[in-house]
A protein has these predicted regions:
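Surface-exposed short loop/turn segments
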Residues: 34-52, 106, 111-161, 175, ...
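Extracytoplasmic/secreted envelope proteins and their assembly/folding machinery
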Residues: 97, 101, 105, 111, ...
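Short secondary-structure boundary motifs at beta->alpha junctions and helix caps
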Residues: 82-91, 158-199
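Solvent-exposed amphipathic alpha-helical surface segments
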Residues: 111, 115, 197-200, 204, ...
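Sec-dependent bacterial lipoprotein signal peptides
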Residues: 1-31
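Generic short beta-strand segments
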Residues: 64, 133-137, 169-170
Length: 234
């Protein structure tokens, strides 16, 4: 019979397969590159505003707790039935709870109403901690609104007792349900919520760790307390 011959043993296939390998790899890489453009990355902002009142305390801001659907970089859309989907074409600059923690710290710093603010991992000695839960951070349809809801508790860092608690909610209209408009609306709503949180904390009566310099100047038995230089305190 005329025509091309067929390899008769397994070893006869090695040469042709070796010649095909580079072409197969190139085809796979080409397919991966043509899957679509990379999503646009969006950040959240930290608003700046002068806030009256000052608590003068040291605050630690913990990363908000969140359900798995919110512990993501994806932009979430929720319809009237409660069904959740992820909006294509965009993503957040970091895992959402961690990004919100950073921007809330920045908002406190921008307001300049707190003596010091940092993360628990900083090792700073604090008067209180802000423990929070991210409840909602999504685009609601068909109303086309950005919805943000955060539950915040002020906790005495010396004994773990809850000093106060409040739920903060904010909404912002969204022109259309696409990545750019969704990110803009959620950033606007979060800015409102974060400013409300800073005002609330700054205006609250909060516990403070005992300041050694502010303790009584006498020891038990009436002995005068002296500083390290041996002189009575001023």
């Amino acid at each position: 019979m005329s025509g091309s011959s067929v390899p008769s043993s397994p070893t006869d296939w090695v040469g042709p397969l070796r010649r095909l390998a580079p072409a197969l790899v190139l085809a796979a890489l080409t397919g991966a590159c043509s899957s679509g453009p990379a999503p646009t990355t969006y950040d959240l902002s930290a608003p700046t505003s002068r806030i009256s009142g000052s608590s003068g305390v040291q605050v630690l801001v913990a990363e908000p707790a969140a359900l798995q659907t919110l512990s993501t970089q994806q932009i979430i859309v929720k319809d009237a039935s409660g069904a959740i989907s992820f909006l294509g074409g965009g993503q957040w600059a970091d895992n959402l709870p961690r990004l919100i923690q950073t921007r809330l710290i920045n908002t406190f710093e921008n307001a300049s109403q707190i003596r010091g603010v940092s993360r628990p991992s900083s090792g700073a000695v604090a008067d209180v901690q802000l423990i929070s839960e991210l409840r909602s951070f999504e685009i609601a349809t068909p109303s086309n609104e950005a919805v943000v809801e955060i539950s915040v508790k002020i906790v005495n860092d010396s004994n773990g007792r809850i000093v106060n608690g409040r739920i903060f909610r904010a909404r912002a209209p969204v022109a259309s349900v696409d990545a750019a408009n969704a990110a803009r609306g959620l950033d606007e709503a979060l800015s409102v919520a974060m400013l409300d949180i800073v005002r609330w904390v700054s205006g609250s009566r909060l516990p403070r760790r005992e300041d050694p310099a502010a303790t009584a100047s006498t020891l038990p038995g009436g002995e005068e307390r002296r500083d390290t230089a041996g002189t009575p305190p001023a």
